[in-house]
Amino acid sequence: MLNPIVRKFQYGQHTVTLETGMMARQATAAVMVSMDDTAVFVTVVGQKKAKPGQDFFPLTVNYQERTYAAGRIPGSFFRREGRPSEGETLIARLIDRPVRPLFPEGFVNEVQVIATVVSVNPQVNPDIVAMIGASAALSLSGIPFNGPIGAARVGYINDQYVLNPTQDELKESKLDLVVAGTEAAVLMVESEAELLSEDTMLGAVVFGHEQQQVVIQAINDLVKEAGKPRWDWQPEAVNDALNARVAALAESRLSDAYRITDKQERYAQVDVIKSETIDQLTAEDDTLDANELGEILHAIEKNVVRSRVLAGEPRIDGREKDMIRGLDVRTGVLPRTHGSALFTRGETQALVTATLGTARDAQVLDELMGERTDSFLFHYNFPPYSVGETGMVGSPKRREIGHGRLAKRGVLAVMPDMDKFPYTVRVVSEITESNGSSSMASVCGASLALMDAGVPIKAAVAGIAMGLVKEGDNYVVLSDILGDEDHLGDMDFKVAGSREGISALQMDIKIEGITKEIMQVALNQAKGARLHILGVMEQAINAPRGDISEFAPRIHTIKISTDKIKDVIGKGGSVIRALTEETGTTIEIEDDGTVKIAATDGEKAKYAIRRIEEITAEIEVGRIYNGKVTRIVDFGAFVAIGGGKEGLVHISQIADKRVEKVTDYLQMGQEVPVKVLEVDRQGRVRLSIKEATEQTQPAAAPEAPTSEQGE
């Protein structure tokens, strides 16, 4: 019989329910977590045995949103969910990052976590619910896992921290921060902010970690009642004798190799040392496993780099702990793009472009939480040549999506409002060289490219990656880390922002025991580095260019009466389509009567504005217009007087004498002056050629609404 075990607890303004034992009983563990009608079903399956020769931990986290959760049917051709969206990929990474470091060293059994959103309240984002579910399922499973973790979203509204704000509250918040950690320590932070101070950001991290203890307590209570027996897994015994043999052959040579400052030369030398050491040892004893020897060599590498940093010696490339690598900043490097920049920091380089488009180019995202339009796009590409390798080139991988989102968060706070700058903006960062912190190089390059494109960003932004090496109470915070320092260190801490404050903060911690004091040191050191980089960037370009590129579309804005919108659009869009083709422009009309005309040629834009003004102009009784004969009938002629408006000249109003046959006086296409006699209630217009020719008044153009240009 089904025997569900349930735990409920209050979490800020929400009630959270954990339920297990009801569904997916063949999985290693399964939990249904709900938070005010948003429910996520999370399963964990772990293999009892590792695959032979497995030398890494194969953890897979899948996060999937089902449209039935929001009471909808998918809009795709096949009417079913397809490959993961960008949002789903980002949440899968959000779950993966804090749980991965909590599996023990040497555990290489395959583990898969699947989180499925099965019900959604539009006010409660499922990401925090999914993280809590993954933590609970892993803790229940008996798999070696040093959890549980808690997860919290922190907002900042009216100078107050808000725990797990609703979607409506987030719109008012200056901060959107997700923090995850164990009972003792913070493990992961992901955030975007409206240029907040270091102290405010750190306060949010501490607040979120304190508040999530209730989650950890609830999961521990559930595990006591429903947890499976802990696996009898033990790490392989350390072979001290073999470790000593490998160290005797390789340690001093690896120490020398890590004094080579050039990345490619260093890697080549390290590969030679490893290869020669493994060959020598396997020749002496053919029972030795090359993979095991490789792991021992990697541990020696890690120890060499870390011990030198902790001893206060220069880093791998000869820098001191707070030194930034050499910077090279260039703008306007590509002639036909709307904005471009080449940002180089040491052996990390990003070629970044900014492209301007119209509102029609904005991305419409059909998400579970509702449809939204994104007018700022940021794409990050990491080709294999950037690290001197060959590899597959194609659709973006999880890492590229994650790095692109982080870089976008770094720039978002300084982007202009749509009403001031009505363009869709796409930034693309091509990583041409990489040796640490390419996402932060993308932030710097994006700021430069946007200024080069004439986008009126509120301030320049720069990003920096910090690292940490910690042994016991001894620690060193490193500025502008290399790829090796990221890989061999204990923390990856990325901060982006302007001179005024922080716009994005991402933190991934691989060890427990990172204190508030260490985070404070890292944030303050990052601020110094950020200000240094901004100073160099400002020497290349210190303000947005006064005008956008000649190759970018210029958007002109005019306002028409809302009851005239139908006239400009026409039946089935016929008028606006014809206008677009005739003028060579892009025309967009909003519900409030705002008309945006985009054109790369100013004359085309002026022509389009004139045509719209003609269409929307009111016909004035008693006024004379230049018209064109469009139809001839027995009782008169129809004459177009501009703006798609047509009136009837009765046969009696053609001349000041009796007219027997209309075609004796008028021909199709003939231009004639006409006077407006009357516009009846149905909008029908009576015209007179006779009265127009009697008057000496010159022909008039329709009166036009005022226009304003938004560039």
Curated annotation (Swiss-Prot):
One of its GO terms (molecular function) is 3'-5'-RNA exonuclease activity. InterPro entries: ExoRNase_PH_dom1, ExoRNase_PH_dom2, ExoRNase_PH_dom2_sf, KH_dom, KH_dom_type_1, KH_dom_type_1_sf, NA-bd_OB-fold, PNPase. Residues 689-711 are annotated as: Disordered. The keyword Transferase applies. Keywords: Cytoplasm, Magnesium, Metal-binding, Nucleotidyltransferase, RNA-binding, Transferase. Its cofactor is Mg(2+). Mg(2+) binds at D486, D492. GO terms for biological process: mRNA catabolic process; RNA processing. It comes from the Bacteria. It is an enzyme of class 2 (transferase). Its EC number is 2.7.7.8. Residues 553-612 form the KH domain. Residues 694-711 have a biased composition (Low complexity). Transmembrane segments: none annotated. Involved in mRNA degradation. Catalyzes the phosphorolysis of single-stranded polyribonucleotides processively in the 3'- to 5'-direction. PANTHER family: POLYRIBONUCLEOTIDE NUCLEOTIDYLTRANSFERASE, POLYRIBONUCLEOTIDE NUCLEOTIDYLTRANSFERASE 1, MITOCHONDRIAL. Belongs to the polyribonucleotide nucleotidyltransferase family. Component of the RNA degradosome, which is a multiprotein complex involved in RNA processing and mRNA degradation. This is Polyribonucleotide nucleotidyltransferase. The lineage of its organism: Bacteria, Pseudomonadati, Pseudomonadota, Gammaproteobacteria, Enterobacterales.
